[in-house]
A protein has these predicted regions:
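Single conserved hydrophobic/aromatic residue that forms the stacking wall/gate
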Residues: 1-6, 204-212
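Active-site region of glycoside hydrolase catalytic domains
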Residues: 7-206
Length: 212
């Protein structure tokens, strides 16, 4: 049978002009679009990917300005856009389970940063692990835990609250329950890894519980 990724990178320009992922209604726009796809194709599709690589279209498109729409937005806007993307995912999972014509398998895919140990020593391995999952203000839109924790653990990582502070998104009652709708699989795209050349600089990082 067919397998469907509902959303990868492109975004309708008419909706971009209305604020895009910053618009509070953006998650509902997405569900409306996804419903059209489900109504048309769910009789022949089992595996559904709601959203692919939000780190790419949010991080590269709105944080560092390398992809369309080539913007560099402040942390507060990036956090709210991320939250709306996650809401779109959760609402779409719920809609697919309610409306699909055949039993669906639903997931979400990330583009995951990865650091490789410089050698096989326990210290180098731990340094690489902590670098891979470190949460920083400058790179939070690319961090795995920022996207995965709300879906699998029902909340943003604790580091996010201490790092972003007042720039955390507006989280309404019921949002996290929607975002953390059960999924059937978890997609991971790892395109490359990098070795940590200065491990001493990361020895101060505390352990972080991750979903991986």
């Amino acid at each position: 049978g067919s397998e469907m990724c509902i959303r990868d990178r492109d975004y309708p320009y008419a909706l971009h002009q209305k604020g895009g992922w910053l618009n509070p209604d953006s998650s509902d726009w997405f569900v409306d679009y996804a419903k059209v796809v489900v109504d048309a194709l769910s009789d022949r599709v089992t595996y559904w990917m709601t959203i692919n690589e939000p780190q790419v279209f949010i991080g590269c498109g709105y944080a560092i300005g390398k992809f369309a729409p080539f913007q560099k937005l402040p942390a507060r806007d990036l956090a709210q856009m991320s939250h709306n993307v996650l809401l779109a995912h959760g609402k779409t999972v719920k809609m697919i389970r309610e409306c699909a014509k055949k039993a669906p398998k639903i997931g979400f895919a990330f583009s995951t940063p990865c650091t490789t140990p410089t050698d096989n020593s326990p210290l180098a391995i731990e340094i690489a692990r902590q670098k891979s999952f470190a949460f920083t203000r400058e790179r939070f839109a690319f961090e795995t835990a920022w996207w995965a924790d709300p879906i699998f653990l029902g909340d943003y990582p604790q580091d996010a609250y201490s790092v972003l502070k007042s720039d955390m998104p507006n989280i309404k009652e019921g949002d996290m329950e929607l975002i953390s709708q059960p999924v059937d699989f978890y997609g991971v795209n790892i395109y490359y890894s990098q070795a940590e050349e200065n491990p001493v600089s990361y020895t101060h990082l505390r352990a972080h519980e991750t979903v991986l």
